[in-house]
């Protein structure tokens, strides 16, 4: 597990670690990966490789169970709180929600996500992201969320919009995606804004 990092206003304090499990609703749970999940995670990625490759730049780095095992170990030992949750629907692994980065100095974090092709369009990602965001704002006391996606990745953009994030900007040629540059868009929301929005729903 990563070691806690002190809050900026009190270097001796320790923020809480992300929970190892988050219940979303009946049958939908988020679990931090363990080494025993490596094979199932690789199979899920491999079966959806063509589908995911359209917008995710890391597929060529995942070619074996050992690659996934190394990733799980790296996250476990990461001191900067890179963190992922496996999305399980009645036990079946269907995707991932990840804390791609956490900036403890400014109490902000970035969120990423993907879901298998057969599980897309069912609201699974939106519900899962909402649960992780609540955990980060309420339990981890973070202040600002950023989601950055490819400008033409309309399903991922729709997730950010459904979650109530605002569009803050467009970056030209932000990412090299296998054979081309792609623009990205950045969405964001702060904890106070999230609380107002949640209270209204």
What does each model-found stretch correspond to?
Residues 53-73:
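Conserved GNAT-fold acetyl-CoA-binding loop/helix
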Residues 35, 46, 62-66, 81:
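Generic alpha-helical scaffold signal
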Residues 1-40, 44-51, 86-201:
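Acyl-donor (CoA/ACP) binding surface of acyl/acetyltransferases
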Residues 72-86:
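A short helix-loop-beta-strand connector motif used in the catalytic cores of GNAT acetyltransferases and
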């Amino acid at each position: 597990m990563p070691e806690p990092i002190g809050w900026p206003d009190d270097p001796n304090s320790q923020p809480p670690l992300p929970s190892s499990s988050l219940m979303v609703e009946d049958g939908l749970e988020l679990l931090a990966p363990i080494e025993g999940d490596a094979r199932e995670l690789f199979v899920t990625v491999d079966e959806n490789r063509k589908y995911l490759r359209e917008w995710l730049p890391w597929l060529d780095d995942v070619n074996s169970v050992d690659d996934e095992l190394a990733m799980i170990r790296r996250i476990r030992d990461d001191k900067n709180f890179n963190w992922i949750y496996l999305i399980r629907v009645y036990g079946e692994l269907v995707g991932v929600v990840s804390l791609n980065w956490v900036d403890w100095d400014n109490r902000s974090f970035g969120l990423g996500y993907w879901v298998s092709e057969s599980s897309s369009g069912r609201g699974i990602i939106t519900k899962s992201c909402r649960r992780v965001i609540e955990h980060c704002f309420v339990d981890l006391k973070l202040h600002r969320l950023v989601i950055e996606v490819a400008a033409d990745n309309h399903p991922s953009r729709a997730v950010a919009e459904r979650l109530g994030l605002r569009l803050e900007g467009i970056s030209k040629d932000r990412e090299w995606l296998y054979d081309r540059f792609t623009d990205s868009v950045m969405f964001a929301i702060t904890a106070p804004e999230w609380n107002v929005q949640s209270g209204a729903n």
